[in-house]
């Protein structure tokens, strides 16, 4: 009750550049260099700026810019190697669509090669349509702890949608395939859940933050 309503308009944001390194844009009196990939992250950033301005009187714009430019967010179109292999925890239709749109914008000449797993409570009907429309190759797997849909159940869902796919027994096996794709032709995308983060990072020699979940 009596809360202040702030409306963020796309017309208030001036996009300066958008590439595989991040996004630069102008908003209000700010010129922002955001190191996160994806135009959807611009709205997240602008929302954070507005919240900070409400909470902090006379906020220092230089400090805001410095904080943003040092931002990192694991599992959000995160580049895992110098080749084009990414990890994204997108696990619903909107998140997966944003991921696909971002990667296609950055790599318009390449096909998508995916390693996918997901929880059983998601809307697989719409997600399956996205996968069929967007991916040239898709591999499915399950996490070690069995939190996610079994490969057998996920395979049946994709079969009903006439989606060609390869089933593998583990994240490790799927990652090994992704690592060996033709990077001149494909972009590798590992996506669908944060539950596989530790397994994915282990395969790429990256440290796993135990606060991640």
Regions found by a protein language model. Give the residues of each.
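Nucleotide phosphate-binding/pyrophosphate-handling subdomain across enzymes
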Residues: 28-137
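Extended acidic/charged loop-beta regions that coordinate divalent cations
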Residues: 1-30
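Short hydrophobic/aromatic-enriched beta-strand-loop microsegments
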Residues: 3-7, 111-112, 137-140, 208-213
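Glycine/aspartate-rich loop-and-adjacent alpha/beta segment that forms the canonical ThDP
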Residues: 194-213
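Short SAM/SAH-binding signature in class I
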Residues: 47, 181-196
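Short glycine-/acidic-enriched loop or helix-start segments at secondary-structure transitions
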Residues: 96-97, 124-126, 150-151, 199-202
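Short, acidic/turn-prone active-site loops that include or flank metal/cofactor-
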Residues: 10-12, 116-119, 141-147
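C-terminal helical cap/extension that packs against the catalytic core
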Residues: 1-2, 20-22, 84-85, 128-187
